[in-house]
Amino acid sequence: MIKKKILIATGGTGGHIFPAYSLAKFFSKKKYKVELTTDRRGLKFLKNDLDLNIIKINSSPLIKKNIFKFIISFFIIIISIINSFFFLLFNRPSIIFGMGGYSSFPICVAAFFLRIKFVIYENNLIIGKANKFLLPFCQKIFVSYKELEGIPKNYNYKVIEIGNIVREEIINFNKNS
């Protein structure tokens, strides 16, 4: 039996990594083949106690402080989208979960061009820049809070409130004390 492959594309901060890792653990227990992408910052948060392929994405936020930094960051993002395109072309998952953050952006854009289904998850009260840009292209938007700001009304049909994705260690904290 061929395992379905799930790719989780996440930003590099703890607010992105920990929900992504919890999701990876959940799908691994359900016997899916799970891969996770993040940037160099995210690697320091991850312990690989799962059968999980972790791929480092070299990307950048779009820096608008001066024209020189803007041009450099723009080209880094374009190169990252191209690299993500070829990665997905040869490692095609069944679905992608975009967890927000600038390092999830290139994977989700490449997925759109390759017609790979992807959903996004937003765990803040205000939608992040990467997720906001991806709204027209994703299949669904999973949110922690129904009161999420920044989603235009014409995308409300895509929104599904699921709450916060919480690590198992936190859920089981009182059970083990």
Predicted regions and their residues:
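An amphipathic, basic-hydrophobic alpha-helix
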Residues: 66-95, 113
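Catalytic machinery of carbohydrate-active enzymes
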Residues: 2-4, 29-33, 79-85, 94, ...
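Conserved nucleotide-sugar phosphate-binding/catalytic loop shared by glycosyltransferases and other
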Residues: 3-11, 29-76, 160-166
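A short, glycine/small-residue-rich beta-strand->loop->alpha-helix junction that serves as a flexible
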Residues: 8-21
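An aromatic- and histidine-rich active-site surface loop
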Residues: 41-45, 84, 93-114
